[in-house]
From Swiss-Prot:
It is found in: Cytoplasm. It is an enzyme of class 6 (ligase). It catalyses: tRNA(Arg) + L-arginine + ATP = L-arginyl-tRNA(Arg) + AMP + diphosphate. GO terms for cellular component: cytoplasm. It comes from the Bacteria. Belongs to the class-I aminoacyl-tRNA synthetase family. GO terms for molecular function: arginine-tRNA ligase activity; ATP binding. Keywords: Aminoacyl-tRNA synthetase, ATP-binding, Cytoplasm, Ligase, Nucleotide-binding, Protein biosynthesis. It comes from Idiomarina loihiensis (strain ATCC BAA-735 / DSM 15497 / L2-TR). Its main location: cytoplasm. This is Arginine--tRNA ligase. Gene3D superfamilies: Arginyl tRNA synthetase N-terminal domain, HUPs, Isoleucyl-tRNA Synthetase, Domain 1. Pfam families: Arg_tRNA_synt_N, DALR_1, tRNA-synt_1d. A motif ('HIGH' region) lies at residues 127-137.
Amino acid sequence: MKEQLEQLLAEAIGQLKAQGTIPADHSVNIQLDRPRDKSHGDFATNLALMLAKPAKSNPRQLAEAIVAAVPENSLLSKMDIAGPGFINFTISQDQLKDQLTAMLNSDSLNVDVAEESKTIVIDYSSPNLAKEMHVGHLRSAIIGDAVSRVCEFLGHKVIRQNHVGDWGTQFGMLLAYMEALDNQSAEYELSNLETFYKAAKQRFDESEEFADRARQLVVKLQSGDEYCLKLWNQFIDVSLSHCQDVYDRLGVKLTRDDVMAESAYNDKLPGVIEHLREKGLLTEDQGAQCVFLEEYKGKEGEPLPIIVQKKGGGYLYATTDLAAIEYRQKELGGDHLMYFVDARQALHFDQIFTLARKAGFVEGDIQLNHYGFGTVMGKDGKPYKSRDGGVTKLADLLDEAERRALELLQQKTTDLSEEQQKRVAEVVGISSVKYADLSKNRTSDYVFDWNHMLTFEGNTAPYLLYAFTRVNSIFDRLGDTAFDRNADIILSDERELALANQLVRFNEVLHQVQDKAMPHFLCGFLFDLAGRFSSFYEACPILNQEDEALRNSRLKLSMLTANVLKQGLELLGIPTLEKM
């Protein structure tokens, strides 16, 4: 409906340009917002205020001209001018009912899918395989996963890329430690990667002989030595298995097939350097090969270097990222490359994207976007740590989430068996961790708070999961009793109308999530939907409604609410429960 209204306004502006009211060559950006005050209608625009100066007109008079120029239509029931020139629009009930019916009759809830499907390559998670995944890896994995699900739902081809770190000097240290252990000990110690890494690091720091051996093994590994590759493959296999366990528990759709590791680009890196040389972009600086871009300068005004090859011949992240960009466009056919990486890498990606275009690693109008995110903080305002002050392993965090959720459920009266309680606790616990993150603005830091995320009140996973079971319970009680699914929808009560207005926003919100890569818009929508359904449920009898037409209508509204909640949570990677 938002798109329809934008089209009507575009036609009105076109008419005013033709009349000379607005300069014909003036570019107009039509922006519609949702008013917080429901008395101001369903949509509002400040278009008249923005165009008043170029039109040399009083904003309110221009607003009147815009309203008069809107073509006759069935979309709107009312247009009002407020204050100095804001225009408020109210959607007609007939239009609302038609949209609700279309949503009920569609497996995809009548969401507008892309007319031309794009190939979107999404880089997310991408942990360093030298260690186990920790709490710092949470945001990339679940935000990237939610956005990829939404893009797929909106009709795009999504190619997931897990650009894991599996190369570099630290792997020499790990291989040297594996070599020093017998097979049985190595297998045992690899079961806890964090312990393994710490033990290897301690040996590296304390023994010069061990450190020398580690450096030798790095050189051998990078030159393709069969023995080193065997040890390395053994380590990588164990580490990837640890990652997959975490993805499976989190409900993240990444698999081994999505792994395109740093090492996969090794053979392409000499070609990257040669290509930059041919383009005349390389400069040698203290023995290293660098690119200096005028667009990025230091405090003294000097161009900042992008180092692509070290003095000793080794390559850096920048080199690998350039190779990956070229591969993702030219071999995977990406139209849009999305990167979900910590906000602290913003400058790195700005430089790499600029260089990729300048050097011709990408061609045409391909989109390159880095979507940074903030940090998970503790209550002390510092990055979240375990109780002993160390880094919290993600697997341990999920264990604690399940334990706390089980304790919460056991405090409530339930007819669930012990086994069912454990399953519900698993879903509630892990969903609470995910939702607490996804419901925050992606670009902001947030405080990790068990008490807040594991409550049945407010914008939390337990609240939404319970809201779904509450809607579902209506149909459990209805049982096999038939109701007329083709009955007219009636919106006679203000709570019915409020619920209907929220339901039809689903399409708009999903496109907002895709365009901004911001899952918190969907979380906010679902929270508002659950709240409006609760008000509707309390005020409007459903199963006990004697008027059959009203009863059928309210059952249809309830069914659509359940469908939207279920689909919305699924797009966030959160499974629903039939009972809690």
